[in-house]
A protein has these predicted regions:
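A short linear hydrophobic-aromatic micro-motif
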Residues: 76-77, 144, 288, 422-427
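Glycine-rich phosphate-binding segment of PLP-dependent enzymes
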Residues: 41, 83-84, 94-120
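Long amphipathic N-terminal alpha/beta scaffold segment
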Residues: 52-97, 103-104
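Conserved PLP-enzyme active-site core in the AAT-like
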Residues: 121-338, 371-372, 451
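Conserved C-terminal alpha-helix-loop-beta "cap" of PLP-dependent enzymes
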Residues: 357, 361-443, 448
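Structural motif of enzymes handling amino- and sulfur-group chemistry
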Residues: 307, 315-316, 323-371, 381-384, ...
Length: 457
């Protein structure tokens, strides 16, 4: 061991090698020097624990240094290939934007824009003017605005409408979303007092009515988008709650969570309420996400009665939680696709959800055949996947995947694919790596084939 440690090359000696001089010209001397030190530190540690008993050749060492250097220069936030079959994969960024949305964001980011400028009047304008008319047209609401995500939207609504008073909501709707974001905690942060009514599995309209007092500021309904209570249950519809609110002059707020502008039942996904239905039911103000079933950028979209939305726009938090020009441009383009009637074809989330099992099976068979020609052992298998993003929690989508039989272990192959310059994220089932076709773009296939050619060689 001591002999091996003494034989480890010096940093300066390695930096003088032609291969690393070439690398330094590309990446910079500082980056290459750091890569050399990292590689030697790792080699030294491997020798000490006994996993390395022979020094690598100079060529092999240079290859390790080069790989380390290039890996360190890759951006931390970068694109991946989602082969999990989960369309709204929260950890992988949820909704993929449409080409139209990407072009719109690029168009306003490369130069100046009309973010807060009224071209007709030649004076300062309102940033929400770019999306408010579209949102009102699509949902039937009187007014609209946008915060930077749905949690922010809920925070703004409760702060503006309920601070210092009570908010009545059902015990069965006290949700927690990702990151321990709990509705009771949000109310406390807004200065509102939570008034729970009903039970976990059953809440009646009379429970809300009996709880109303002089301190009541709002009635809150929360769509349990990431879980369902089934069996002996009862809940109050938005329409019934809105009628109660009107009769007592109390605003009704609804957090729709995922948010949906089209009926997903034809795609096999039922019981996901649409925004239009809640607006038609008379809910005063409601919020939903932009980057889930809508298929746009991250945003907390708020629509409702003008008197409520105006209060929100004037609240100090509105400025702190407002969205930027890239988000507004991408959201406007996404909404325009709905207005044009091309959302199902244009928006990746919807087009992925709309793929039939037969289409997915044919795509899987084609990929499996091409992988077999590259020496990869694989077969086509049937899969069931959740939509993801906390949407439609009790239903799955039938799909097909290419199941790859690894040389060693599925875990080792999964890690290898994950560490590529363009990471490929797969699922493991029965010690095989699954490439689910539902979330694979046509442009992903060549990269996948190249990755498996390299692993097979």
């Amino acid at each position: 061991m001591d002999t091996l440690l003494r034989q480890i090359p010096k940093v300066d000696d390695l930096l003088r090698l032609p291969a690393l001089n070439t690398l330094a010209a590309e990446a910079g001397t500082s980056a290459v020097t750091e890569a050399v030190r990292r590689t030697l530190d790792r080699l030294r540690a491997d020798i000490l624990v006994g996993t390395v008993t022979e020094l690598p050749s100079t060529e092999a060492l240079c290859a390790q240094i080069s790989a380390s250097c290039r890996a360190s220069r890759l951006p931390s936030l970068r694109g991946v290939i989602n082969a999990t079959g989960i369309v709204l994969h929260t950890n992988l960024g949820r909704a993929c934007l449409s080409d139209r949305a990407l072009a719109a964001a690029r168009g306003v980011s490369q130069g100046y824009s009309t973010l807060e400028y009224d071209l007709t009047a030649g004076e300062r304008g309102q940033r929400y003017a770019h999306v408010e008319p579209l949102l009102c047209r699509l949902t039937g609401a009187e007014a609209a605005m946008v915060a930077n995500n749905n949690a922010a939207a809920v925070l703004l609504i409760l702060s503006a409408l309920t601070a210092g008073g009570e908010v009545i909501t059902s015990r069965g709707e006290l949700v927690e979303i990702g990151g321990s974001f709990r509705m009771p905690d949000v109310m406390a942060a807004c200065g509102a007092v939570l008034r729970e009514v009903g039970s976990t599995n059953k809440t009646h309209l009379s429970d809300y009515a009996n709880a109303i007092s002089e301190q009541t500021r709002a009635l809150l309904k929360v769509h349990t988008s990431n879980y369902r209570i089934v069996g002996f249950t009862e809940s109050v519809s938005p329409a019934a709650l809105a009628e109660l609110g009107r009769s007592r002059s109390i605003p009704v707020i609804e957090d729709l969570g995922s948010g949906c502008l089209v009926d997903l039942a034809p795609l096999g996904l039922r019981d996901e309420p649409t925004v239009q239905a809640s607006v038609k039911a008379g809910v005063d103000v409601l919020s939903f996400s932009g980057d889930k079933l809508l298929g746009g950028p991250q945003a907390g979209i708020i629509v409702g009665k003008r008197r409520c939305i105006d209060l929100l726009k004037r609240h100090p938090l509105a400025r702190a939680l407002r969205v930027d020009k890239l988000t507004l441009a991408a959201l406007e383009a996404t909404l325009q696709a709905y207005v044009d009637g091309t959302a199902l074809q244009e928006i990746p989330v919807l087009s992925m959800l709309a793929q039939t099992p037969e289409e997915l099976r044919q795509r899987a068979e084609s990929l499996c055949r091409r992988m077999g020609e590259s020496g990869v052992t694989a077969e086509v298998v049937s899969t069931e996947n959740p939509v993801g993003g906390g949407a439609v929690p009790t239903q799955t989508l039938h799909s097909f995947a290419v199941a790859v039989v690894p040389r060693d272990s599925a875990a080792a192959l999964e890690a290898q694919l994950r560490q590529r310059p363009v990471p490929i994220i797969v699922r493991i089932a029965h010690d095989r790596c699954l490439l689910d076709m539902r979330t694979l773009f046509p442009a992903d296939l060549d990269e996948i084939l190249q990755a498996f050619r390299e692993t097979a060689s």
